[in-house]
């Protein structure tokens, strides 16, 4: 009986992981543990044969975010395997972000069999419920143990996962009960793998395919007739939520839409929009701040979630015309201001249906409308002011970095922006300079959680990568450096060291004294970054002159591994300089 259970634990684990590779899984992040032993051993066998990439992480929280980074950059489903107990609870932060950003991860968690539940057994908790609120599906094998499952059971689980990620990409929780023994003898492992290799490894299966472009969408033509292509409007593109594999079709549809409308386009730094799109307006957030009344139109087409801009939110809230919000991979409500008609089926389907409603516009391309010309000229005026003001000296500030860095980091190399200050500064000051490349930022739940682990996951797929992050965001996830071969990944970390949460200076400084502000919000930490980097064997370079930053990037790229470039920020000078520039723009 014991031999049967150990063989079945291993064999069913092999089947399961192999079937996941057949629906496109290439990467698995493995966390340590005993109860998950059969999964670990099975993953090891598949890894030896190059069927599955396996990377280990001792921190489940970090592993979850690392897997999310991989999934985001690759467009493929990724796996995380953990043991039982609190290990499962540590997956929740990454599951929340995967849920809100619509990225597919399967969290596979090992558990005790049913006989050990609710009786005080060690390391036995109600882990099957931990991720319920954020996962698209919560699945399980036989509650007595996976050894009691058959071929059809395992296949059905993977078919369910495939169907779910096609319908609504996001996290999935698969809880697997394992009865002891968890280990397997060398003899039994060899014997079982030979059977698996002969009958299962090269077996083909028919899984559902993505036919998103051919959905039979029943959407009223009256909806599209509300759009008047003869009148002015604006296209606003927020953070991209689709798959990286769909970016080409996304941009093709957007290009077609802009051509038939002639409308100007506002884009987020992480919109995924190509720099070659016509009608792009630079410095649009500063235009809204300076004079939103310059925008005279009665219709707006929005794509994706709302950008992190109070000025944009205020503009849309007070806009009296038609707003249509088109979503990618997201069937939930996505408009916090609640003033738009929401379309769930993506931009490609939207443009096709729009053209169907306006057949006479199909082949007509319009020049940029007058509103677009006005906005682009206004953006150019602000650009000249920024050019004059930003580089009057070489002191490094956060807003200067937002403008300068995307222009000197090689234009085809990707960038990731951490949450909090960087994404907001780049929205305001980057002048669309991110659009020549892939630019990532995790705007689902918008937390600083998992910043380093996410970046390392992206760098595993697309490199070299630049991560722009504040000091608190980096230290919060410093365990990311403990992920297998993390130090060898080609990641440049631009560390903006302002000794705490500088964003809170802008929010609470006026009503709190300095010590209260530090204790309650900024929370400064006197970290010796040089010693910390040395402890993880990560090279670090300090830069204090803006003109030396290009040279520092050349150094980091030559290292071809994880490195830190640290820039120290004088918070008082930062705030004064920022306010002076904004005043100059507003009074111009």
From Swiss-Prot:
<dbReference type="GO" id="GO:0009234">
    <property type="term" value="P:menaquinone biosynthetic process"/>
</dbReference>
<dbReference type="Pfam" id="PF02776">
    <property type="entry name" value="TPP_enzyme_N"/>
</dbReference>
<keyword id="KW-0786">Thiamine pyrophosphate</keyword>
<dbReference type="GO" id="GO:0000287">
    <property type="term" value="F:magnesium ion binding"/>
</dbReference>
<comment type="subunit">
    <text>Homodimer.</text>
</comment>
<dbReference type="InterPro" id="IPR011766">
    <property type="entry name" value="TPP_enzyme_TPP-bd"/>
</dbReference>
<dbReference type="InterPro" id="IPR004433">
    <property type="entry name" value="MenaQ_synth_MenD"/>
</dbReference>
<comment type="similarity">
    <text>Belongs to the TPP enzyme family. MenD subfamily.</text>
</comment>
<dbReference type="GO" id="GO:0030145">
    <property type="term" value="F:manganese ion binding"/>
</dbReference>
<dbReference type="Pfam" id="PF02775">
    <property type="entry name" value="TPP_enzyme_C"/>
</dbReference>
<dbReference type="GO" id="GO:0070204">
    <property type="term" value="F:2-succinyl-5-enolpyruvyl-6-hydroxy-3-cyclohexene-1-carboxylic-acid synthase activity"/>
</dbReference>
<comment type="function">
    <text>Catalyzes the thiamine diphosphate-dependent decarboxylation of 2-oxoglutarate and the subsequent addition of the resulting succinic semialdehyde-thiamine pyrophosphate anion to isochorismate to yield 2-succinyl-5-enolpyruvyl-6-hydroxy-3-cyclohexene-1-carboxylate (SEPHCHC).</text>
</comment>
<dbReference type="GO" id="GO:0030976">
    <property type="term" value="F:thiamine pyrophosphate binding"/>
</dbReference>
<keyword id="KW-0460">Magnesium</keyword>
<keyword id="KW-0808">Transferase</keyword>
<comment type="pathway">
    <text>Cofactor biosynthesis; phylloquinone biosynthesis.</text>
</comment>
<keyword id="KW-0479">Metal-binding</keyword>
<comment type="pathway">
    <text>Quinol/quinone metabolism; 1,4-dihydroxy-2-naphthoate biosynthesis; 1,4-dihydroxy-2-naphthoate from chorismate: step 2/7.</text>
</comment>
<dbReference type="InterPro" id="IPR029061">
    <property type="entry name" value="THDP-binding"/>
</dbReference>
<dbReference type="InterPro" id="IPR012001">
    <property type="entry name" value="Thiamin_PyroP_enz_TPP-bd_dom"/>
</dbReference>
<protein>
    <recommendedName>
        <fullName>2-succinyl-5-enolpyruvyl-6-hydroxy-3-cyclohexene-1-carboxylate synthase</fullName>
        <ecNumber>2.2.1.9</ecNumber>
    </recommendedName>
</protein>
<keyword id="KW-0464">Manganese</keyword>
<dbReference type="GO" id="GO:0042372">
    <property type="term" value="P:phylloquinone biosynthetic process"/>
</dbReference>
């Amino acid at each position: 009986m014991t031999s049967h259970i150990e063989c079945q634990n291993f064999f069913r684990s092999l089947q399961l992981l192999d079937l996941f590779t057949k629906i496109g899984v290439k990467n698995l992040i493995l966390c340590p543990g005993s109860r998950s032993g059969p999964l670990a051993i099975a993953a090891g066998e598949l890894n030896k044969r190059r069927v599955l990439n396996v990377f280990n992480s001792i921190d489940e929280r970090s592993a979850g975010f690392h897997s999310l980074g991989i999934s985001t950059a690759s467009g493929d489903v990724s796996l995380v395997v953990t043991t039982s107990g609190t290990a499962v609870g540590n997956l929740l932060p990454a599951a929340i972000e995967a849920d809100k950003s619509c990225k597919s991860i399967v969290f596979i968690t090992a558990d005790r069999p049913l006989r050990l539940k609710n009786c005080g057994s060690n390391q036995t908790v109600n882990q099957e419920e931990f991720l319920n609120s954020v996962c698209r599906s919560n699945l399980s094998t036989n509650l007595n143990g996976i050894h009691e499952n058959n071929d059809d059971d395992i296949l059905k689980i993977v078919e369910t996962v495939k169907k779910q990620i096609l319908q609504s990409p996001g996290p999935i929780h698969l809880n697997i009960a394992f009865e002891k023994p968890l280990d397997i003898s060398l003899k039994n492992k060899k014997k079982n793998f030979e059977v698996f290799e002969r009958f299962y490894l090269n077996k083909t299966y028919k899984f559902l395919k993505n036919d998103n472009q051919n959905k039979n969408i029943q959407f009223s033509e009256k909806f599209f007739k509300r759009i008047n292509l003869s009148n002015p409007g604006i296209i606003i593109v927020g953070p991209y939520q689709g798959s990286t594999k769909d970016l080409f079709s996304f941009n093709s549809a957007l290009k077609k839409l802009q051509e038939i409308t002639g409308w100007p386009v506002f884009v987020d730094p992480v919109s995924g929009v190509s720099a070659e799109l016509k009608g792009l307006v630079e410095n649009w957030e500063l235009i809204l701040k300076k004079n939103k009344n310059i925008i005279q139109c009665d219709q707006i087409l929005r794509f994706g979630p709302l950008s992190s801009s109070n000025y944009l939110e205020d503009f849309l809230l007070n806009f009296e015309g038609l707003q249509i919000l088109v979503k990618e991979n997201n069937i939930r409500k996505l408009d916090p201001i609640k003033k738009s008609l929401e379309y769930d089926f993506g931009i490609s389907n939207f443009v096709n249906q729009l053209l169907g409603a306006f057949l006479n516009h199909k082949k007509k391309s319009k020049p940029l409308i007058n509103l677009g010309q006005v906005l682009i000229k206004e953006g150019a005026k602000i650009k000249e002011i920024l050019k004059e003001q930003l580089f009057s000296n070489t002191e490094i500030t956060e807003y200067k970095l937002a403008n300068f860095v995307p222009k000197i980091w090689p234009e085809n190399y990707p960038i990731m922006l951490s949450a909090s200050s960087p994404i907001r500064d780049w929205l305001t000051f980057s002048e669309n300079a991110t659009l020549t490349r892939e630019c990532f930022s995790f705007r689902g739940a918008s937390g600083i959680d998992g910043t380093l682990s996410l970046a390392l996951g992206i760098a595993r797929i697309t490199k070299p990568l630049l991560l722009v992050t504040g000091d608190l965001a980096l230290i919060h996830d410093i365990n990311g450096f403990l992920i297998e071969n993390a130090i060898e990944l080609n990641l440049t970390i631009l560390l903006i060291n302002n000794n705490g949460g500088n964003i809170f200076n802008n929010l609470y400084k006026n009503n709190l004294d300095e010590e209260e502000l530090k204790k309650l919000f900024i929370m400064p930490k006197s970290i010796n970054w040089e010693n910390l980097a040395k402890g993880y064997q990560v090279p670090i370079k300090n830069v204090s002159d803006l003109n030396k930053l290009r040279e520092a990037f050349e150094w980091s790229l030559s290292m071809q591994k994880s490195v830190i470039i640290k820039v120290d920020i004088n918070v008082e000078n930062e705030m004064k300089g920022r306010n002076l520039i904004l005043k100059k723009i507003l009074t111009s």
